[in-house]
Amino acid sequence: MSQPSTANGGFPSVVVTAVTATTSISPDIESTWKGLLAGESGIHALEDEFVTKWDLAVKIGGHLKDPVDSHMGRLDMRRMSYVQRMGKLLGGQLWESAGSPEVDPDRFAVVVGTGLGGAERIVESYDLMNAGGPRKVSPLAVQMIMPNGAAAVIGLQLGARAGVMTPVSACSSGSEAIAHAWRQIVMGDADVAVCGGVEGPIEALPIAAFSMMRAMSTRNDEPERASRPFDKDRDGFVFGEAGALMLIETEEHAKARGAKPLARLLGAGITSDAFHMVAPAADGVRAGRAMTRSLELAGLSPADIDHVNAHGTATPIGDAAEANAIRVAGCDQAAVYAPKSALGHSIGAVGALESVLTVLTLRDGVIPPTLNYETPDPEIDLDVVAGEPRYGDYRYAVNNSFGFGGHNVALAFGRY
């Protein structure tokens, strides 16, 4: 008995029909895409007061070009955490981009991942209680703190009743959300799903914590040149704020409502390392297995893959492990792009953002240049796209996302 796959009709055909994102380059995805193709960077010197207050070792990052809160009313600010406000903003934008379709709410799901959720409200609530006692804690504190809050806000906003879910798997959360949304659809539990990831803003505590792990770049004098995925001289990642969502649905559902698909979502692979809390397994075996599984479910072979959108954080061990994973999966012939070189790392949102970029590569037949890839690492044998955009006949692509805790997620996409 053969493995069921999208290619052999074992799973229904799933398509991507709308995308949206906000980034440190632009508040909309199409302008972000143009900026990436032009070699722009969203990473700059941070001017936040907390940088000098705490004399942080890392003084660079990428704030959103257009702050989420500039679109929020007074009640939104009081009743929702930051990621919930981002979810509301992006959910509305995505639905408008999709043409505000009429869908059956009982066949409509929402899956949105995050790394920390509304964690800032924990600190705020503690400070209020410390200053004035328990009665100063807002009755809305729980709903603002809960990690599933952003997905719940979108589900309420759009009326989704086929399930609202929130993967919390560190840096793979956004991609895992898309994977679970795909599963909801191919298992017959939904026809359409909003999926993606959101994350909080750059703050002092996360910078301090990741810096103490020696995971972040300290090239403070060269912000735009700091994030150097796969480069021999890479020294860590840089934070870059973002949020991203996509609308996926069965091809049959999309055609029935007259939607124009952007790409196909063909398969999703999820594995774990069982190796270390924060370090990837250097051999890349289980990460590579996630890639292989996504191809199996898609009905593709490694030779079919023209492009890999890499997790590429620019940490010395992470990039080397990913290169091994790509080799293990047999996809080392593919053209590789590392978006974090330009956009930085948005933790729970980044997998969704990079999935959206993968869709745009397949739509437009072009891969943006990986910034700051100047000195190839002799230990990494990959075809990294750098210097200028690379145009080509890209049919199939894989997006990789790997998270602390040993989480590995790979998504297989196809040109429509």
Curated annotation (Swiss-Prot):
Protein's recorded name: 3-oxoacyl-[acyl-carrier-protein] synthase 1
Active-site residue numbers: C171, H311, H345
Organism (species): Mycobacterium tuberculosis (strain ATCC 25618 / H37Rv)
Domain Ketosynthase family 3 (KS3) intervals: 11-415
Assembly with partners or alone: Homodimer.
Gene Ontology biological-process annotations: fatty acid biosynthetic process; fatty acid elongation; fatty acid elongation, saturated fatty acid
Catalytic activity as recorded in UniProt: an ultra-long-chain mono-unsaturated fatty acyl-[ACP] + malonyl-[ACP] + H(+) = a 3-oxo-ultra-long-chain mono-unsaturated fatty acyl-[ACP] + holo-[ACP] + CO2; hexadecanoyl-[ACP] + malonyl-[ACP] + H(+) = 3-oxooctadecanoyl-[ACP] + holo-[ACP] + CO2
Coiled coil feature spans: none
Residue(s) at site: Interacts with the inhibitor thiolactomycin: C171, H311, H345
A UniProt-annotated Pfam family: Ketoacyl-synt_C
Entry's localization field: Cytoplasm
Regulation: Phosphorylation decreases the condensation activity.
Pathway per the UniProt entry: Lipid metabolism; mycolic acid biosynthesis
Consequence recorded when altering C171A: Loss of activity with hexadecanoyl-CoA
GO terms assigned for molecular function: 3-oxoacyl-[acyl-carrier-protein] synthase activity; identical protein binding
